[in-house]
Amino acid sequence: MHDIDVAIQINMLFLPPTNELIRVDSNSKQLNQPQQQQQQQQQQINNENENSINNQENKENNNKDNNNNNNKEIKQSSEWGSKFSSLFSNMTKKKKSNFDLEMDAIKDAFLLNKPINNEEGLLIYSLDKSKKYIHSLSELDIGYVYLTEKETPIIRQNEDEVILANKVIIQANTMKRFSIKGILQSDVTTNALEIFTKRKMSQGVLFLEEDGSLCRIFYKIQDLITDTIYCNQDDTVMLQKLPNNEGIRFRFRGSFNREQVQQAMLAFSQPSDPQTWKRTIILREQQHHSSQSFTGDSVASRFLNKLSSKTKEDEESNDLKTKRENTVLKLKNRMKIDWDWKYTSTSVPIDQEPPTFIDNMVNRVREKISGSNNKLSDLLSSAKKQPQQQPQKDVTSSSSSSSNSSSPYLDSVDKLVITTNDSSSSNPLPDFDKLSLSSDDKVNNNNVQIENTTPSVPPPPPVGAPPPPPPPPPPPPPPPPSTLKLNRNRISTPKKPNNSGGGGGGGQLTPLQKKMRQLHWNAIPREKLKETFWDNLSPVKGNDNDQTLVESWFSLSPMAKEKMSKENLNNSNNNNNNNSNNNGEEQSLSDSGNTIVISKIIILDLRRSNNICILLSQFKLSYGAIKEAILCFEDGKLSVEQLIALDAMLPISEEEYQSLSSANYQSIEQLGNAERFLIEMMSIQHLQQRVQTYLFKLEVCSLLDSIEINNNQLSKAIEQLRNSRKFIKVLKVIFHIGSILNRGTYLNSTKGFKLDSLSKLSETKSKDQKHTVVDFIEIYIRENQPELLNFYSELDLLDKIPQSSLENILEESNEIENKFKQVDQEIQYHQQLLTNDNNNTLSSSSSSSYDQSKDTYLKVMSPFYDTFNTRFITIKQSTQQTLKQFQECCIYFGEDPQNITSKDFFSNIVKFSIAFKSSSNNAKKSLNLSTLNSK
């Protein structure tokens, strides 16, 4: 099974079902319902789950359904929608809360997309509690409802869609990927995002807006802007915050691993029991180890045929992916981010799987034999043609970017040559586990080209004997043995002959092209070129000088300063009898001594390093200047945005501190930018506390002003409401009319009503459905007590109450109080350092003592604390007085101050005042119209 046992990143879990009938439950009868009615009813049931996030996927499904509908007759079945909805509603009304139900559904969704490693499979219950073991979701019957072990209801809705608890949808409408989507609560979505990305939300997650115009790091799911669609750079995560706290719409898209691909293959062959499953595995093992072709039912061939087909979804998403990549590049360029922070290490990250043989082979199939339907064995046999024709010659191979992958590949090539000589008639599959091809290897039947894939390393210079003549059409003549030699540690190329020399006839090898900086433009699709001027535009007639000039400006070769250092190093190497390989860890020299690879020492996590570098782009200061600005803080040196960025980089964890302290490097320039910055900041004591207190110092004035203004307005509004006599009389009129309406009911026995009843006056309409109780009250007051018509003029301050409620004012006040406590603690800490320094003036180690001349924290923060803390205490007392005033007002109007917020309390009165004013204006307009008509 090793020919299949590779990390094929395609979707094979959801397979086309053989059952086209729709069932509601285990005991229901078959419903003769064709596919179009099934699709229409499913769209009606899942209407709430469809959004712009899914438009691209649903567009492809709708096109497919429309094509199928042309060949089928439609027969209506009205039972399916009602039975399905009632069944799910009954199952979800159990003991679980909405939070527990959503959490179980999302956990089961991730569980069902994990590899099933046991022989039995995954346990699923039917409605009658009978057990069923499955190896993939394709084994679920369409229309049947099952339960997971957490009692989450699950149904396979159609060929490629499975719904869990009517909350989460697992969908795979292509053979490339799967998606998990739905609408969940914010907390549940946060947990799901952390499970999918394997990263805590508190560490920061980089999102782009849907149109690719904004890139931002989010630390809380609540910070998402309502109705805006966000996605990450590789389009695997999409989120949308819905209005009115309806939840978060999400979509996670991923690829299946090799175990899931194996299980999908087995599910496709429909094994009846574990013994059949074992027998299939044994047959695959025999296929791999035997030199004969597999004679059984090759399930693998059906899936491998699908590898060469490019899905329509991938073609449609190319423009969007290109736009997002350009957005990230524009963001980095606009923020002037240093590109050196990118990792140049050849080690593969933990979360990233190395490229597989199948991935590389598919790319080579598309490049070399595009348009043909040859099998995988034909590709391998074509790769063996050259060794068969030249069995006694040395083989020249292209070098990959990773030195670790060259050795297994050469071993595998030797094995391929031996296998070909032994059995020329058969084409057995090679050992895929040992054969490791890099996607950068270029094998050509005509000649051998060598391409360097390291961005910062120029191609090796020409070395060796005079070149062979230019290769004729295939089969090519064998190169001289002295010209090209195969060496696992070094690859020699023919040296370009000197123009002044007369030797060796024939042409010369084309020099290797230099790696260039890419120009990321938005390409026009081929189908749209005919509508543009580009279609008839003739190309520019260029020459060799153009290419040379462009390479001199934009190639990735080392800069002039590095070239000078190389020349000096070459001279010293010649004087030292070719001792150029002594510093092999940090520098690697080619045969001519013109190539130097200088690698950065990377210590931090990749995401952590990237985030720090993005935040550092806001500073136009050196790391030493940032440190000095923190120690000697002055207003204007660091802005609020810069302090927020510094706070986001902190704290430095104990693990990072130890790793940075014990790092082995000769010069700090060898470290990455993030590492250099943190090492510079590590010497500052209580770094994060300093940054937070400095940030508070810059913001405290505006915070106190805002609290003071809002508190004064709220206090005056409460006093105005308490002293309004007209409003009290209006309430009496309302009670009088309400008593008449409630006559003969238990509501008539009351002697008062709460203010939240005012909002219901607009909901109670007259028998002709044209007027409300508010209209009647306005008419009654206008005819009986007209002096009350303008009662809202005594409550004008209620309209000016700020949006923040009294509860928000008190909460902000408590936060400011905690900040002042933090400042006080830091002042005491630095005073203690100063005291210890005075006591240890005779200490021999002056570097470890507290140097007040370099630290102005006490000088800056002590006067600030004394001044603003006194002002805050006064404001704090004022807010407490307003709270007491509000509680008395609530009691005065019959409300419980413990069960109502100030926002709800005042909004009830304001809404009634607005409705009354609107009714009064309408009455005046009607009166004026009637007067004009009478005249």
From Swiss-Prot:
Belongs to the formin homology family. Diaphanous subfamily. Residues 418-428, 444-454, 484-499 have a biased composition (Polar residues). Residues 506-935 form the FH2 domain. Residues 35-76, 702-730, 803-834 form a coiled coil. Formins play an important role in the nucleation of actin and the formation of linear actin filaments. The lineage of its organism: Eukaryota, Amoebozoa, Evosea, Eumycetozoa, Dictyostelia. Residues 431-443 have a biased composition (Basic and acidic residues). Keywords: Actin-binding, Coiled coil. The keyword Coiled coil applies. Residues 444-505 form the FH1 domain. GO terms for molecular function: actin binding; profilin binding. Pfam families: FH2. Residues 52-78, 380-511, 561-590 are annotated as: Disordered. Residues 456-482 have a biased composition (Pro residues). The gene is forI. PANTHER family: DISHEVELLED ASSOCIATED ACTIVATOR OF MORPHOGENESIS, ISOFORM D (PTHR45725:SF1), FORMIN HOMOLOGY 2 FAMILY MEMBER (PTHR45725). This is Formin-I.
